[in-house]
Amino acid sequence: TEMDGFGTNTNVIVVAATNRADVLDKALMRAGRFDRQIYVDLPDVRERKEIFEVHLRPLKKVADELDTDFMAKQTPGFSGADIANVCNEAALIAARKGKQAVGKQDFLDAVDRIVGGLEKKNKIITPEEKQAIAFHEAGHATISWMLEHAAPLVKVTIVPRGQSLGAAWYLPEERLIVRPEQMLDEMCAALGGRAAEKVIFNKISTGALSDLEKVTKQARAMVTVYGLNDKVGNLTYHDSSGQSEYNFTKPYSEKTSELIDKEISNLIEEQYQRAIKILEENKDKLSK
């Protein structure tokens, strides 16, 4: 084929990129075709620092207080494009405020805006709703503070941003290996908002939707992907080839499906009750 090359000295190199290498035709990956594969992960803290330095160069006036090491640590999971957006947004924020130089707070505000969306300070919220949101976010903050493996909290706000009425920002550790106790602590912290509503008001609300989505995905991953459940065992139903997307049947029986659903539910309920217990024992800290 043309990709193989008709001659030996054509000096033509074919380069391609994809986010879904798992669904490509295997014939494309044969020797003589795309026989060099380079996996590009999201930048780590050192690489983010270097990317910040590149994107800060065009900004003519940057305050001396700005520390690229600090900014790299504040942006885990950010891509190069995200960091470019942070720098551009920080410059715009500084310009709107009439500043002579882009400062550290401008960058932190830019990170908040990119992660959480635009502030909606004019959104009408009743005092009762505001109180419920405040205790919900305080629940997240209290649980993350009390648990050893939960990601440290960076910021809590009840100012509406994007589609959320409040938010808690964390600074997750960039781990290559995650232990079960670390995942359980993260689930417990995520359920801290709903647990706080239950402890303070003895009622729950719809405000925990994103938290429930997060813990359900984590619990399902523990049970069906990473083999971290004793009842289901050391099995994984994760198909890294991507072929499972085209199958209409599950790779396990109905009995196993029921067991998986039960274990996922048990995991989430255990962490919810754990969060309630922690908050009841530290109600004074929650109320502060």
Task: Tell what function each PLM region has.
Residues T18, F34, R48, S79, ...:
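Conserved RecA-like P-loop NTPase ATPase core
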Residues L28-R33, E53, E148, L171:
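Short, glycine/charged-enriched secondary-structure capping and boundary segments
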Residues N122-A132:
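Short pre-active-site segment immediately N-terminal to the catalytic Zn-binding motif
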